[in-house]
């Protein structure tokens, strides 16, 4: 069940409030399986059927914009859902992204196609997506939260949201808050 059942005229409903399922293949890549396409506030979908009776690893992407009140996953009566057997994506030392609606996944056709999710699959590394639609304004409280993450790299993409004045006032302090706790970790700035 979706929280708001929002519809955006510039983005697909699958991207806004749908689900994407990926499967880990023997060639060590995540492969798209199917999407749950929303039809309203309450939805029911069969994403995959007629599966071979063997264990596989799956990754489910949640909606990019609309939240979920609840999510129930049904499986065949003989099937089980267990903890992953593989550590993919690798959760240790994630990539942390901070930025705009574009970073959040704005206008991606489906959840798995948000660029941070594509990067996560390609690198097999967890990506923490702190994309705030219209609100990447270099709030120093956000920098403090970001600095608490033991990341492999920080990617800062705030230019489309922050004004020149906000950047002059806050950018260096925002950077220094993160840098003070992570003196040797790369911090990448994305320009407009």
Locate each region found by the language model.
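Alpha-helical cap/lid subdomain in secreted, periplasmic
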Residues: 132-192
């Amino acid at each position: 069940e979706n929280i708001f059942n929002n519809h955006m005229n510039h983005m697909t409903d699958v991207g806004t409030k749908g689900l994407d399922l990926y499967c880990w293949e023997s060639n060590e890549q995540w492969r798209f399986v199917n999407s749950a396409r929303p039809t309203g506030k309450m939805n029911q979908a069969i994403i995959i059927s007629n599966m071979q009776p063997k264990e596989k690893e799956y990754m489910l992407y949640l909606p990019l914009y609309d939240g979920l009140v609840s999510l129930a996953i049904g499986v065949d009566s003989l099937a089980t859902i267990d903890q992953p057997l593989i550590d993919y994506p690798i959760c240790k030392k994630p990539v942390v992204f901070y930025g705009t609606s574009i970073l959040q996944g704005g206008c991606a056709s489906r959840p798995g196609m948000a660029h941070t999710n594509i990067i996560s699959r390609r690198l097999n590394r967890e990506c923490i997506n702190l994309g705030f639609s219209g609100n990447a304004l270099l709030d120093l409280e956000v920098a403090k939260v970001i600095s608490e993450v033991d990341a492999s790299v920080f990617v800062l993409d705030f230019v489309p949201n922050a004004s020149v004045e906000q950047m002059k006032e806050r950018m260096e302090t925002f950077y220094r808050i993160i840098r003070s706790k992570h003196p040797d970790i790369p911090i990448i700035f994305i320009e407009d």
